[in-house]
């Protein structure tokens, strides 16, 4: 059975292991620090006891920023990422969140297509932002009340 639950610093190792095979974005220490922050919310999509996907975000007033979103490579294109985004939108519409921001590499075509599906639009470009020289796209989605 698939379910979505909030996760905490005790889940850092599982998040790190998922990250290693997905992005290799954050090290274990960064995961521990991120999930210990009071202003950070993290949710995971589980199958039984295994984490298949993670989304880390924070809210400031009427804005929400997605800091990390990943699904296990073996479970991509099965709607799990969509479930995480739908959960964030559903849970935060009532909290007066008006818009959602995120940053994504201009080279990550799969992610760009995914975010386009949800209506995210590019509002800014950070030229040669990543180590590989690729641009970062700042994306925004307005939530209609």
Predicted regions and their residues:
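Acetyl-CoA-dependent GNAT
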Residues: 2-3, 9-74, 85-87, 91, ...
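Short glycine/proline-centered loop/turn elements that form peptide/ligand docking sites
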Residues: 81, 85, 108-111, 128-133
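Active-site acidic-Proline motif in GNAT/NAT acetyltransferases
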Residues: 72-78, 106-108
């Amino acid at each position: 059975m698939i379910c979505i639950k909030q996760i905490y610093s005790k889940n850092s190792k599982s998040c790190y292991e998922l990250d290693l095979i997905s992005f290799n974005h954050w090290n274990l220490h960064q995961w521990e620090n991120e999930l210990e922050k009071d202003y950070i919310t993290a949710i995971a999509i589980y199958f039984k006891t295994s984490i298949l996907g993670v989304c880390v975000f924070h809210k400031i007033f009427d804005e929400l920023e997605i800091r990390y979103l990943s699904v296990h490579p073996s479970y991509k294109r099965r709607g799990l990422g969509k479930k995480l985004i739908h959960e964030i939108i559903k849970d935060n519409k009532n909290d007066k969140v008006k818009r959602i921001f995120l940053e994504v590499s201009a080279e990550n075509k799969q992610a760009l297509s995914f975010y386009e599906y949800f209506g995210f639009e590019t509002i800014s470009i950070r030229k040669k932002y990543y180590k590989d020289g690729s641009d970062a796209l700042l994306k925004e989605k307005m939530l209609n009340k």
